């Protein structure tokens, strides 16, 4: 993918604000400038950013319906009613179910959990699950990470004598389900100050409110924060505000005292003994938690997450790891087929957006394939498979473009849809696919902005190699946890040269190990450029080039700072 480098020289006002903040907090101007770009301009705001405190969490009772939800839960416990904790089959849903179930189980035993089967029941609340709940004399269902659009299903549940408390974060329609309580910060009438909680985050706020109402110490919620960190990373929600607090302390819990289930996953991932980051969750832990829901049933994942015996958890984690290996092979095959289809379509006509359909593709993997196609071709993408005459799948978007609105514009062709700005799930009749493709592509072509069609690499600062020190790297660590709205800072250095020892490495000679010299300071830095071996010939030509990179620690040489190079371009003459 070709990236457009996006760098804005700081204004005189920003320079002055940077200097003042750097003096106040005793930090380099480079780091102070990163804070200014994140809207942090005072010493107290910087302190809150670097050291988020759990006592800064928002009062959960500011969320609409929270008092009603807590009262109904207390009432259910008082009446000894059977309670079901129900959730989506992805990471966010499974961690949310595990969190709520584990916490409530400490105080109440007449409770069970339920994850719908992706292939048999589909997304959200199924009639099958409601019939099962009625057969088990369930009187209250707490649904997590789904349910905000389940109007017919919750009306049916009401006929069965089952009440619902919805804990969701997806965008609601104008009409809301007839649940007892709807906890969703994205409600149109929401007064909750932070709008970007994930499903597990909403579940945590519910348990925080329940604990507060019942005089349960907040400290009893802390062991569950590792679930929050995993869900925030995997669901790719903004790591700002309340999410930053939950992610910061959740990572701390994950590193210092993870739950038994999480500890077994960490071991299976080969991460034991390492300081875990949000990237480890996104690329290592999250895919394994997701794997059961993609190729088998998400109930296996919750079984693991609530397990108390480490040896049993390790056995379950090994099985889930096998599911992940199976998922990776399916993913590889489907991605190859998807790329072939796109190349064929592109040879005929440029596509403003991509819609792919293959009835043989596995339903649980289409979301991953949609993400890969979006990344490769940098266009809004929908990938669909088929089950019993109904096509279902996932839509993924590019930075800045709201794919939810694009899908919503075609709602008369759809059976169901729901999601966020950048990710939507949808289903429709197979015969509607051609018209959906036409209208979806037309809507995108009319609404996407030119700058949204280019992959941007947002550079935060231009620096010389002399500025890159171990202290700078250590101070940069304080900006973590990273994620949307708080990305890992990208730096740029211009007019660098190969120091003479750069070489192509890797099993397939796909990476470049670099030793570079900065023409302005004559300082030398080591770096690694993954998947960029095509640039090796230019690098060895003794001409200057510009690089964009993050500053990392060399995991093989502890204490040595190196550059992880994200892009390389010839210097402008």
Predicted regions: what they are:
Residues 99, 175-216, 221-233:
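Short alpha-helices
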Residues 75, 171-184, 516-521:
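Acidic-glycine-rich active-site phosphate/pyrophosphate-binding loop
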Residues 119-121, 150, 170-175, 189-191, ...:
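Short gly/pro/ser/thr-enriched loop/turn and capping motifs at secondary-structure boundaries
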Residues 114, 144, 167-169, 183-185, ...:
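Generic beta-sheet signal
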Residues 150-151, 235:
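Intrinsically disordered, low-complexity regulatory tails of plant transcription factors
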Residues 2, 10-140, 160-161, 211-438, ...:
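Hydrophobic helix-and-loop "lid/oligomerization" segment in the mid-to-C-terminal part
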Residues 139, 180, 546:
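Conserved acidic residues
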Residues 75-81, 312-356, 409-573:
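Mid-to-C-terminal polyanion-binding domains and interfaces
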């Amino acid at each position: 993918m070709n990236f457009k480098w996006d760098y804005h020289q700081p204004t005189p006002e920003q320079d002055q604000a940077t200097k003042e903040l750097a003096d106040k907090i005793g930090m380099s101007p480079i780091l102070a400038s990163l804070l200014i770009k994140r809207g942090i301009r005072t010493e107290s705001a910087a302190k809150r950013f670097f050291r988020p405190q759990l006592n800064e969490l928002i009062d959960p009772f500011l969320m609409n319906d929270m008092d009603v939800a807590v009262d109904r839960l207390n009432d259910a416990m008082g009446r000894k009613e059977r309670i079901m904790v129900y959730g989506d089959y992805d990471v966010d849903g499974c961690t949310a179910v595990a969190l709520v179930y584990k916490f409530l189980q400490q105080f109440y035993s007449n409770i069970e959990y339920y994850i719908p089967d992706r292939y048999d029941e589909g997304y959200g609340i199924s009639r099958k699950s409601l019939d099962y709940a009625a057969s088990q004399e369930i009187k209250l269902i707490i649904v997590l990470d789904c349910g905000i659009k389940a109007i017919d299903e919750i009306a049916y549940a009401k006929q069965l004598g089952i009440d619902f408390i919805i804990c969701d974060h997806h965008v609601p329609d104008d009409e809301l389900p007839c649940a007892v309580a709807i906890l969703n910060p994205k409600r149109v009438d929401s007064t909750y100050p932070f709008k970007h909680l994930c499903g597990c985050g909403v579940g945590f706020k519910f348990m925080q409110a329940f604990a507060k109402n019942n005089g349960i110490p907040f400290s009893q919620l802390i062991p569950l924060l590792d679930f929050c960190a995993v869900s925030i990373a995997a669901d790719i929600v903004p790591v700002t505000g309340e999410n930053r607090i939950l992610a910061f302390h959740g990572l701390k819990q994950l590193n210092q005292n993870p739950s038994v289930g999480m500890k077994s996953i960490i071991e299976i991932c080969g991460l034991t003994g390492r300081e875990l980051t949000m990237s480890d969750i996104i690329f290592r832990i999250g895919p394994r938690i997701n794997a059961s829901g993609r190729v088998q049933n998400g109930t296996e994942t919750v079984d693991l997450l609530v397990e108390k015996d480490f040896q049993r958890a390790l056995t379950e984690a090994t099985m889930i790891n096998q599911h992940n290996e199976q998922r990776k092979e399916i993913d590889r095959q489907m991605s190859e087929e998807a790329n072939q289809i796109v190349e064929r379509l592109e040879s005929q006509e440029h596509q403003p957006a991509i819609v792919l359909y293959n009835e043989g593709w596995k339903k649980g993997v289409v979301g991953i394939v949609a993400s890969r196609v979006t990344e490769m071709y940098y266009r809004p993408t929908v990938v669909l498979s088929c089950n019993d005459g109904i096509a279902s799948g996932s839509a993924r978007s590019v930075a800045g473009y709201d794919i939810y609105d694009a899908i919503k514009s075609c709602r008369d062709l759809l059976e169901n849809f729901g999601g966020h700005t950048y990710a939507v799930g949808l289903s429709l009749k197979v015969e509607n696919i051609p018209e959906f493709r036409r209208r979806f592509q037309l809507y995108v072509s009319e609404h996407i902005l030119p700058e949204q069609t280019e992959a941007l690499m947002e550079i935060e600062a231009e620096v010389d190699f002399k500025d890159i020190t171990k202290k700078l790297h250590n101070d940069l660590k304080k900006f973590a946890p990273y994620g949307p709205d708080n990305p890992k800072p990208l730096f740029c250095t211009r007019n660098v040269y190969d120091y003479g020892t750069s070489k192509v490495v890797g099993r397939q000679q796909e990476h470049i190990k670099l030793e570079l010299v900065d023409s302005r300071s004559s300082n030398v830095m080591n770096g690694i450029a993954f998947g960029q071996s095509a640039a090796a010939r230019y690098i060895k030509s003794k001409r200057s080039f510009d690089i964009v990179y993050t500053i990392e620690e060399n995991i093989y040489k502890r204490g040595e700072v190196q550059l992880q190079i994200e892009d390389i371009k010839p210097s402008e003459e």
